[in-house]
Swiss-Prot record:
Residue ranges with Polar residues bias: 184-198, 271-282, 879-892, 941-952
Chain residue ranges for the region called JNK-binding domain (JBD): 210-226
Effect of residue 276 to A: Results in loss of phosphorylation of MAPK8IP3. Does not effect binding of components of the JNK pathway
Record protein name field: C-Jun-amino-terminal kinase-interacting protein 3
Region spans: Leucine zipper-like domain (LZ): 424-459
A single GO molecular function term of this UniProt record: mitogen-activated protein kinase kinase binding
InterPro entries linked: JIP3/JIP4, JIP_LZII, RH1, RH2, WD40/YVTN_repeat-like_dom_sf, WD40_repeat_dom_sf
Residues annotated with Phosphoserine modification: 315, 365-366, 603, 677
Subunit record text: Forms homo- or heterooligomeric complexes. The central region of MAPK8IP3 interacts with the C-terminal of MAPK8IP2 but not MAPK8IP1. Binds specific components of the JNK signaling pathway namely MAPK8/JNK1, MAPK9/JNK2 and MAPK10/JNK3 to the N-terminal region, MAP2K4/MKK4 and MAP2K7/MKK7 to the central region and MAP3K11 to the C-terminal region. Binds the TPR motif-containing C-terminal of kinesin light chain, KLC1. Pre-assembled MAPK8IP1 scaffolding complexes are then transported as a cargo of kinesin, to the required subcellular location.
Main location as per UniProt: cytoplasm
């Protein structure tokens, strides 16, 4: 029961009364209590109340113990029965799985045997095919050898044939010489022979039929008349010329004929021998074989009969080879003596001398005819032309046996030569027959080879068909394997159904499987089985992770909506027996063994809070039930609220237990102890600087559905307002910054103290101009808004405006342009790159740049103050949006993002530790959009935009941009869930968007390093932006740096010195922003599914938190060595009780280092502050860390967490301040009683001093604990710096008081049907502000 009392000073005293809750006792205890009650009534009636006054508490205690033991016994029996049933089910399932495994093994053995049998059959077929192939190859080889032998035999026969031709030619020449010699010998007696034989009847010779070669190599025609062969233009003009060129002239025709036919043949008139090489002439000096054989047969018929002549003529069809030795042999003489006589006769007779000119003319003027063999001077065509021009009578005379040899008689010894010629012709005919037979055999062999080649082609086709069938079978096997995996997945899904359905499906599958023959069942190899098992293990691992997340989510939801009824309730029996002493049903207020916690809160002064400030920290309206999916009646809702209050009451009772810890300023502090220090054991004074809570209130009271997402303090470093030109815009008044007013009024120098989390050891610390102004991102069902407050006056909202209609996930304050920033041109290629080569690829320090660097002056973007800017375009269908209003606003975006991330197989352990040489970096260029029209419709509503769209600034009426809204000044960068990035000014005209760009995925984190802004996207890429030449941010050119797979996101980033640490999956990538290279990668957690969520840096240490993990890990900033592990779950369980409100599952949702403290926010709304120490004392007195100093390292100690770590400053500079490692000890941890109902969304630290403004009025009175409430005004106090730490989250709770809804009973007592508000004040989004004093390092 909540009671509120007003004191005279205007303050409100609020305290909590305990009262009983109605719980039913067991029947046995109730009956026993009734019996004892009646007995007590009888005793009181007889003897008065004093008799049972001392006895009744003992009896009540016994009954309570009995009731608790009885309930525990019943629970144990129920649990035992459940365990027995589970055991039986497990045994049954084990037996069934065992039988199924045995069946599967048997089937696998059968499959393997069938596969082996099929493999053997295929092997036999392959061997058979190989044997046939070898046989065919052997046959082909034999045929090739036979063909080669036949070709050799054919060549040999050709050689023999040529030899026979040569011999035949020689014989013919010898025969012709013999005939000519015989004629020459019989020249003298020819006249006598004719006179002695006057009555000899002979036939006339054919006209001009002379076959005897003369000296000039021409065959002469004698008969009268001019012979004009066809085509001859060298014929003789008249008979006189023909007769003058002959060897002899006869006075009459008869002598002319005999002289012409008996003329001697001489090689030349000059007597010289011809040197013409050996040439081939046709047989009997005739070229056309078929036409020239007939006259030659007639010529031979002098010694043979007509039949033999015809046989020789028909069988002679080859050319005669004339050897070179026979070219100088004279024709017509048998010896040299006879030739000398003839030569003398020729020389003495001028008529016998042939004219050289005529011979030359006759022999050299025919292009187609002439002497073939110059050695013998024979005209090969003369006989042919004579026969062709002669009539049929002459040819008939020749066939009948004309006397070609004239009147000469032939001797008998010449008939033997003709026989030999006939034998040669017969042998020639036999050789021709043999040749024809060989040709027939050759043709048969060629046909056989063709047949074998065809058979080989057929076999090749069959083999190719077998290969194709094999490929088809392999594809079929793969399809069956895919179907098997699909069926397995369906079976796994079916296992999750009720057990009866699974059994029915299993029996059905077994029945169907039995119907299929063994040969047709699916087969898969051992490799496939191993792959399936590996995939199953991966799916199991992912399923366990998802079950863990679901378990945590269900635990939180159940703790809110369906809390379990507690076992032990002391007030039940007391309420039953209280009726003995009082007739009133209302229980008396219970006495406390400890003083009640009072909260004094005075009204603020004029300079401080406004009058609409709440009167007390816990002045909270009636609580309401959380968001429910199904409507419940009023009775169920009341029971749920009652159970929730009981849970918070148990937490309150546990917190109030005296465990030796101190309570001061709303914190649970450990007992004081003296901490060892390197100086000699002086007491550490940091324990005295306890954070003081100064403010707690809903951020926006008008809209109860507002949710907080993120926040950031304004960083004004590097910005000098007095340098701005007043003509270009309104000059910011220094008084507009409340922090500036307060510090100037107090006489403090402006921003002279450095923020400890922003210090860098290697550069000169400059004046930190961090403002006390804080930008907080809130969202409703439709829009996201920015609420700007001053931490010194958190109750006053400076300004608020709408950003977009999607959730804004991150915000970061970017300082003004500084001389220490990287030059803007370093991210471009060399200046000599042609701007027109838009497709050129360049390499810059190992970075792949896509496109070319065009140094274009893009006008600065500007978005007018709008309430509904970026609408999700069609190309971004995968990005979640809340425009339709169907997304649950209470669902955390980080949980939604976790659900979309799928763990990949990832590299091996060895690959995980290696550093990649360089990420894939893409240089993106976006074309400037055209100047928007006068309409106020945003450019993002066109619907045709793509990733990288730039919204350009709207030009003011004056045509110039105000310098106060220039992005060269401090700016605030906001990243939305739909991929939009907004840039607003942090100094003036906050509502005006200076730049905006659409990226390809959700923006999750933003950091700034020396003129570079790194934007982490949900697809695992980093977008790196830089300033332009004029100092303003240029969003038209940026780099995309790919860190991994697109289904893993970069969840967090932190600036460590001049490096950026990126949390990607379970790894931390250390990136150099200047070179855009990954310098180092290491695993922050051994499991790939455990993602890095928060990073906090100070000095030489970086604290890292892991998703769904309560352990914080400390890593060295330079060596990346794992230094310390801190688990907060035991501490939270000890402070708030194990299992209370689902606190057994602790996860870290917010992390910050401020005021020399490590601030930790959990998913349960608990805020923990751990002082940072230079040394950590373990239980055995061992030191965990030492102060860093300027000495050289001596050894490499500290290889594991808990060892001694020696850290040394930078040796390159003597002026560099030595940094320290921020160790933490849970023995010094401090838990704040002020927390949130849901997860702590963010921590923000800004400089400020609220205590001076409130004149000592704080939320928790300093008198509660011995800790100081405000810094002392002595010399030590002048060195202390003040900082304000803000936390934001859903709802508010004080763990010392409980739910804070006890006043709801009184408010709702009068009207039972009163409708409760949709969201109580305690469940709205709250911000809590602490002030902490610390000594700068």
């Amino acid at each position: 029961m909540m009671e509120i009392q007003m004191d005279e000073g205007g303050g409100v005293v609020v305290y909590q009364d305990d009262y009983c809750s109605g719980s039913v006792m067991s029947e046995r205890v109730s009956g026993l209590a009734g019996s004892i009650y009646r007995e007590f009534e009888r005793l009181i009636h007889c003897y008065d109340e004093e008799v049972v006054k001392e006895l009744m508490p003992l009896v009540v205690n016994v009954l309570e113990n009995l009731d608790s033991v009885l309930s525990e016994n019943q629970e144990h029996e129920v649990e035992l029965e459940l365990l027995r049933e589970d055991n039986e089910q497990l045994l049954t399932q084990y037996e069934r799985e065992k039988a199924l495994r045995k069946q599967a093994e048997e089937k696998f053995i059968e499959f393997e045997d069938a596969l082996e049998q099929e493999k053997k059959e295929l092997q036999i077929q392959v061997e058979h095919y190989e044997f046939q192939t070898r046989q065919l190859e052997l046959k082909a080889k034999n045929y090739a050898d036979q063909i080669s032998r036949l070709e050799e035999r054919e060549s040999e026969m050709k050689k023999e044939y040529n030899a026979l031709h040569q011999r035949h030619t020689e014989m013919i020449q010898t025969y012709v010489e013999h005939i000519e010699r015989s004629k020459m010998q019989q020249v003298g007696g020819s006249g006598q022979t004719e006179s002695s034989l006057p009555g000899r009847s002979r036939k006339e010779r054919p006209t001009s039929l002379n076959v005897f070669p003369l000296a000039d190599g021409m065959v002469r025609a004698q008969m009268g008349g001019k012979l004009v062969p066809a085509g001859d233009h060298w014929h003789l003009s008249d008979l006189g010329q023909l007769q003058s060129s002959s060897s002899y002239q006869c006075p009459n025709d008869e002598m002319s004929e005999s002289g012409q036919s008996s003329a001697a043949a001489t090689p030349s008139t000059t007597g010289t021998k011809s040197n013409t090489p050996t040439s081939s002439v046709p047989s009997a000096a005739v070229t056309p074989l078929n036409e020239s054989l007939q006259p030659l047969g007639d010529y031979v018929s002098v010694t043979k009969n007509n039949k033999q002549a015809r046989e020789k003529r028909n069988s002679r069809n080859m050319e005669v080879q004339v050897t070179q030795e026979m070219r100088n042999v004279s024709i017509g003489m048998g010896s040299s003596d006879e030739w000398s006589d003839v030569q003398d006769i020729i020389d003495s007779t001028p008529e016998l001398d042939v004219c050289p000119e005529t011979r030359l003319e006759r022999t050299g003027s025919s292009p187609t005819q002439g002497i073939v063999n110059k050695a013998f001077g024979i005209n090969t065509d003369s006989l042919y032309h004579e026969l062709s021009t002669a009539g049929s009578e002459v040819i008939g005379d020749v066939d009948e046996g004309a006397d070609l040899l004239g009147e000469f008689s032939v001797r008998d010894d010449f008939f033997g030569m003709g026989k030999e010629v006939g034998n040669l012709l017969l042998e020639n005919s036999q050789l021709l027959e043999t040749k024809n037979a060989l040709n027939v055999v050759k043709n048969d062999l060629i046909a056989k080879v063709d047949q074998l080649s065809g058979e080989q082609e057929v076999l090749k086709g069959e083999l190719e068909a077998a290969k194709q069938a094999k490929v088809k079978l392999e594809n079929r096997i793969k399809e069956l394997e895919e179907e098997l995996k699909r069926v397995k997945s369906e079976a796994v899904t079916a296992r999750r159904e009720p057990r009866e359905e699974v059994e029915d499906v299993s029996s059905y599958l077994c029945t169907e499987l039995d119907k299929i023959p063994m040969a047709q069942r699916r087969r898969f190899t051992r490799v496939e089985m191993a792959r399936v098992l590996m995939e199953r293990n991966q799916y199991k691992e992912r399923l366990m992770e998802l079950q863990e997340a679901v378990r945590w989510t269900e635990m939180i939801r159940a703790s809110r909506e369906h809390p379990s009824v507690q076992e032990k309730k002391k007030s039940t029996i007391w309420q039953f027996f209280s009726r003995l002493f009082s007739s009133s049903s209302s229980p008396p207020p219970a006495k406390r063994s400890y003083p009640s916690v009072n909260i004094h809160y005075k009204s603020p002064t004029a300079a401080g809070f406004s009058q609409r400030r709440s009167h007390a920290l816990c002045q909270i309206s009636a609580g309401s039930r959380p968001l429910e999916f199904f409507p419940d009646d009023d009775c169920t809702s009341s029971a749920r609220r009652e159970q929730k209050r009981e849970q918070y009451r148990q937490v309150r009772e546990h917190v109030r237990n005296d465990d030796g810890r101190l309570q001061a300023c709303g914190w649970s502090l450990p007992a004081k102890y003296k901490q060892l220090s390197p100086n000699g054991g002086q007491e550490d004074t940091r324990m005295k600087n306890v954070p003081v809570p100064v403010y707690c209130r809903p951020l926006v009271e008008k809209d109860p559905s507002t949710k907080l997402w993120c926040a950031a303090g304004v960083n004004l470093s590097g910005w000098k307002p007095h340098e701005e030109d007043s003509s270009n815009g309104p000059k910011p008044v220094p008084g507009r910054d409340p922090l500036t007013c307060d510090r100037e009024g107090e006489g403090e120098p402006k921003s002279t103290h450095p923020s400890p989390e922003k210090k860098k050891a290697k550069e000169t610390p400059e004046a930190d101009a961090t403002s006390s102004r804080v930008w907080i991102l809130t969202s409703t069902l439709t829009t996201s808004k920015v609420v700007i407050i001053d931490a010194n006056q958190p109750g006053t909202i400076v300004d608020q405006f709408t950003v977009c209609n999607a959730h804004v996930l991150c915000i970061s304050s970017i300082p003004a342009a500084s001389d220490s920033d990287y030059p803007p041109g370093e991210m471009f290629l060399d200046s000599d790159v042609n701007p027109e080569d838009s497709g050129a690829d360049g390499v810059l320090a190992g970075i792949t740049l896509v496109g070319c660097a065009t140094r274009c002056n893009v006008p600065r973007s500007n978005c007018s103050s709008r309430g509904d800017t970026p609408v999700l375009d069609k190309g971004q269908g995968d990005v979640a949006t809340t425009a339709n209003g169907k997304v649950n606003p209470s669902q955390s975006t980080e949980e939604a993002t976790e659900a979309t991330e799928v763990p990949d197989p990832g590299p091996s352990e060895s690959e995980a530790t290696t550093v990649r040489p360089g990420p894939l970096t893409e240089h993106v260029f976006t074309d400037p959009a055209p100047t928007p029209s006068s309409s106020t419709q945003p450019a993002s509503e066109n619907g045709s935009e793509s990733n990288g769209t730039i919204v350009q600034p709207q030009v003011e009426p004056s045509g110039e941009l105000s310098t106060t809204t220039s992005s060269a000044a401090p700016t605030m960068w906001l990243g939305a869930q739909n991929g939009w990035l907004y840039v607003h000014s942090a100094v003036a005209n906050w509502k005006k968007c200076l730049h905006s760009i659409k990226l390809k995925d959700s923006v999750l984190s933003l950091v700034h390093v020396k003129g570079r802004v790194l934007v982490a996207l949900a697809d695992g890429t980093l977008a790196i932006f830089h300033r332009g030449e004029d100092g303003q941010w240029d969003l038209s050119n940026y780099h995309l740096m790919d860190l991994g797979h697109p289904h893993h996101s970069i969840r967090c980033m932190a600036v460590v010195n001049d490096r950026v640490w990126c949390g990607y999956k379970n790894k931390v990538h250390v990136i150099q922003p200047k070179t855009m290279q990954i310098e180092k990668s290491f695993d922050a957690h051994p499991r790939r599914e455990s993602q890095v969520r928060q990073l906090a840096w100070i000095g030489d240490g970086v604290w890292v938190s892991i998703r769904l993990d309560s352990t914080l890990r400390l890593y060295h900033a330079h060596t990346h060595q794992h230094l310390q592990d801190v688990d907060i779950e035991p501490y939270v369980s000890k402070m708030l009780g194990t299992g209370k409100l689902g606190f057994s599952f602790v996860r870290i949702t917010a992390l910050l280092i401020a005021g020399n403290r490590l601030w930790v926010g959990t998913g349960n709304g608990v805020v923990i502050s751990i002082p940072l120490t230079e040394t950590v004392v373990l239980h055995r007195g061992q030191l965990l860390g030492l102060r860093a100093n300027k000495t050289s390292p001596t050894s490499g100690e500290g290889t594991r967490p808990g060892g001694i770590i020696h850290v040394y400053g930078d040796d390159s500079s003597d002026k560099a301040a030595s940094s320290f490692i921020p160790y933490c000890s849970m023995a010094q941890a401090q838990l704040c009683f002020h927390g949130h109902r849901d997860a702590v969304k963010f921590f923000v630290s800004v400089p400020g001093n609220v205590l001076a403004t409130l004149n000592g009025s704080v939320l928790d009175s300093p008198s509660e604990g011995p800790g100081p409430a405000a810094p002392a005004a002595d010399a030590e106090g002048q060195k202390l710096k003040n900082a304000l730490v803000l936390s934001g989250g859903e709802g508010y709770i004080d763990f010392r008081i409980g739910d804070g809804e006890d006043d709801e009973t009184e408010e709702c007592a009068g009207d039972v049907n009163q409708t409760k508000p949709s969201l109580s004040k305690a469940e709205r989004s709250h911000i809590i502000v602490w002030q902490v004093s610390y000594t700068p390092e």
